């Protein structure tokens, strides 16, 4: 697995190999492990439908394989030891019975315009990939400050005083 940032001394580009399990233990399970490749994220705890499945996985590390029941899951990513969810994803694993895969955490928690956002991608031994869709949440405003206009300026419509548009700038 490739991870890191090309030219960055703190989180340099790197390749990490890992063992690969070809199949789950039975057709009712999916065997998965996690690779944490999000450079600006702390160690994470991963919850599947509110159950802790991976604990304290740090950047550049793989978890051990686990077996989960074939099902659809909501995956919550939290900083290790923190109750606040950083991101949530839909994981439709109901059709993955008997299969295995690696969930790669990739991107940036706080991306710039040219960077990719934080995402989870399931990669299977046969080369299939599935980007897990982010769970849509209601937008809420945390900081409800009032805007108070202190100055208003009238900008002239010269040379045409009959121009039907007037601009008012305030700061």
Language-model features and meaning:
Residues 1-138:
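Intrinsically disordered, low-complexity polar regions and short flexible loop motifs
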Residues 140-158, 162-171:
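Glycine-centered coil/turn sites that cap beta-strands in beta-rich domains
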């Amino acid at each position: 697995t490739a991870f890191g940032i090309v030219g960055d001394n703190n989180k340099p580009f790197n390749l990490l190999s890992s063992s690969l399990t070809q199949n789950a233990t039975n057709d009712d399970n999916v065997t998965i492990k996690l690779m944490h490749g999000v450079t600006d994220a702390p160690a994470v705890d991963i919850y599947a439908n509110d159950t802790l499945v991976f604990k304290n996985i740090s950047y550049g590390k793989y978890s051990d394989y686990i077996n989960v029941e074939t099902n659809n899951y909501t995956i919550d990513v939290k900083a290790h030891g923190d109750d606040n969810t950083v991101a949530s994803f839909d994981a439709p694993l109901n059709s993955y019975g008997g299969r295995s895969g690696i969930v790669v955490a990739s991107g940036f928690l706080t991306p710039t315009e040219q960077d990719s956002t934080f995402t989870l991608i399931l990669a299977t031994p046969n080369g299939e990939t599935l980007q897990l869709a982010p769970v849509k949440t209601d937008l809420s405003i945390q900081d409800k400050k009032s805007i108070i206009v202190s100055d208003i300026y009238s900008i002239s419509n010269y040379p045409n005083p009959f121009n039907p548009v007037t601009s008012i700038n305030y700061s």
